[in-house]
């Protein structure tokens, strides 16, 4: 066997030292609260409805809906509209359910979600999907503070994630949200 090897060696130039790694964002230990919940607006949902009626929602694929199942009554959530900012903090009051079977408490009692006076034209998008992968799902939330999207809180380096529901433990974001919002007791 023959080996052909060639080394290119050069003198180390002054100042050509490897750059140090970028520091990681500070993370607080996660104690089960709060969760960050993305509220993506579109044809089947808008933040004004979620704010008015007390819910977060997702649909259009299993990837979007799956993490809603992490939320349970009593969980604290911070709601963020992607590319806009944080708009609400509240407590989950009812676990995830399909939009076509969900009911929402109103002054007149429990009303089916699809019968609410909603701003969107198609709140029941994909409800004909038999295996739930596309159907719109909602989780009810009692907002301790909920703002219009025009008053969202966003500062450089705040926590954002593409998943619908994630653990919120980014220390700087938690501090900013505790300063900006009224939190439930």
Language model features: what each stretch is:
Residues 1-37, 41-42, 60-63, 101-185:
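Contiguous surface segments at macromolecular interaction interfaces
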Residues 41, 81, 94-96, 145:
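Short, flexible loop/turn elements at secondary-structure junctions
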Residues 42-58:
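Short, basic/aromatic beta-hairpin or loop at an interaction surface
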Residues 68-72:
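Short, well-ordered loop/turn sites that connect or cap secondary structure elements
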Residues 78, 91, 140-142:
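Beta-strand cores of modular interaction/reader domains in eukaryotic scaffold and signaling proteins
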Residues 80-86:
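Short, charged beta-turn/beta-strand-edge "cap" motif at the junction between a beta-strand
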Residues 86-97:
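Short beta-strand-centered aromatic/proline hotspots
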């Amino acid at each position: 066997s023959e080996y052909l090897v060639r080394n290119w060696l050069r003198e180390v130039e002054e100042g050509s030292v490897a750059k140090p790694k970028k520091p990681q964002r500070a993370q607080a230990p996660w104690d089960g609260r709060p969760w960050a919940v993305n509220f993506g607006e579109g044809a089947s949902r808008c933040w004004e409805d979620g704010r008015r009626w007390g819910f977060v929602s997702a649909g259009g694929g299993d990837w979007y809906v799956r993490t809603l199942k992490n939320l349970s009554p009593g969980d604290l959530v911070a709601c963020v509209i992607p590319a806009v900012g944080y708009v609400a903090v509240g407590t989950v009051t009812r676990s995830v359910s399909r939009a076509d079977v969900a009911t929402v408490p109103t002054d007149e009692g429990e009303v089916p979600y699809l019968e609410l006076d909603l701003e969107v034209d198609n709140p029941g998008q994909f409800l004909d999907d038999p295996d739930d992968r596309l159907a719109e799902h909602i989780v009810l939330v009692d907002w301790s503070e909920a703002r219009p999207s025009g008053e969202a809180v966003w500062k450089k380096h705040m926590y954002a994630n593409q998943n619908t529901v994630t653990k919120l433990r980014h220390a700087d974001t938690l501090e900013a949200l505790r300063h900006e919002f009224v939190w439930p007791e």
